[in-house]
Amino acid sequence: MADEFESLFKISATGTDLNGHTGTADLLINATSASLSSEVPIDNTDVISAKTICYDLAYASEPTSFLQWAAENGAAGSIDGRGMLIEQAAVSFNTWTGLQPDTAPVIDWIATI
């Protein structure tokens, strides 16, 4: 993904262990299953700044352990995987029916439950 965006702005990406990483990240994506067992896949709080957005592919009715960790360590914001789930469902619906559903009301509604 970094290769696709490098012509637009400075970007670097890593899929490695961030526990020894120095410097802060603009975006941290948790694509592990750690949140499903209430674990946090990283201990290094030095990667978070007041500009860091944290995204967890997992979703739950309450913030995941990763998103709680992000908030506790000063991240600018956090997003869970519910929006991704809804958008993937919309693509599937469109593939099968040819109709494009309006996902905004669903995203708004699911945020309330």
Name these PLM-found stretches.
Residues 1-9:
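NAD(P)-binding Rossmann-fold cofactor-contacting core
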Residues 8-78:
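Rossmann-like adenosine-cofactor binding region
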Residues 57-113:
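Adenosine-phosphate binding glycine-rich loop
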